[in-house]
Amino acid sequence: MSSYSSDSTAARDQHAPLLRPRHDGSFSSSSSSARPTALAVLLGRITGHRAPSMLVRETAARALEERRIDWGYSKPVVAADILWNAALVLASAVMLVGTVEERPNEPIRVWICVYGLQCLFHVVLVWSEYWRRNSTRRARDLESYDHEDYNIEYDYEQDSDDNSTTYSFVKRCESINTVISFIWWIIGFYWVVEGGDKLLGEAPNLYWLSVIFLAIDVFFAVFCVVLACLVGIALCCCLPCIIALLYAVAGTEGVSEAELGVLPLYKFKAFHSNEKNITGPGKMVPIPINGLCLATERTLLAEDADCCICLSSYEDGAELHALPCNHHFHSTCIVKWLKMRATCPLCKYNILKGTTDQS
């Protein structure tokens, strides 16, 4: 683990948070973030990186999942999702009404009807979750405003627990609907193939509508699988790209430039300073900020002289930042991370609150 080799425990107790502790009432859009995501667990099993770097990648995977869910329930995406599925429901209804004279040799009409009902159920789930998120956000903002006026402490933990329960129920319903849709797709594919030319001749409109629905599902399934593979490869091989992406879409969860200026800044000096571009055991020499030296010189062991974000060893002269929890990283790497999330990527220590994020 990238930690200082001397007096790390005592130094941790002496460090105070950059800012005084504050209540954070923001409810994470992903209530399941308290548990490792499937992608994070998979990364932990298939990659060969050592433990600290794997922790960073699992944290990045959870952050990416939270961003994905937040983006998935944004107004434009929800509107597009509802309109798309509503169009499928409308197409199913119009086709079922307009083809009453067709007599297919397979129960393809039943398949189209159930397919439309599944789309409608998906619309209900998406809208209910979107409405719940907006209602919770408005209620929380109003409660926070009122409680600030009257110095009343708001029970954010209870609010988060209630929302987690509701979110879990919606997720279970969506998962069940996805499984049923997959099974129903297989049944529809079988009926279309079994019907063959006879189905095409007796009910051409129903046949082609079924083929279109099946093709749409295949397209989205392939797209999601390819996207998940690309994200997994990026997390394993190019974490800085993921951090840059998260930083580009980050909200207000990170730290400001003024808060970053409080962090101790070091320059790594290899023990064999007469050789250039050498990596390995060395020491962290503090760099004065505004004429003040905020830290003391630290010695690093060989296994600690690398950055767990970019997986690169510290080169002689590299600038490093150290967090109050004693973990250290390349300055450029950790600055991008902290602007996205105000927690240590290894131990989840929140540099604003002075506490460890248990999620």
From Swiss-Prot:
It is a multi-pass membrane protein. It is an enzyme of class 2 (transferase). Signal peptide: none annotated. Pathway: Protein modification; protein ubiquitination. It comes from the Eukaryota. Disruption phenotype: Embryo-lethal phenotype. Embryo development arrested between globular and torpedo stages. Its main location: membrane. The keyword Lyase does not apply. It is found in: Membrane. It catalyses: S-ubiquitinyl-[E2 ubiquitin-conjugating enzyme]-L-cysteine + [acceptor protein]-L-lysine = [E2 ubiquitin-conjugating enzyme]-L-cysteine + N(6)-ubiquitinyl-[acceptor protein]-L-lysine. This is E3 ubiquitin protein ligase RIE1. It comes from Arabidopsis thaliana (Mouse-ear cress).
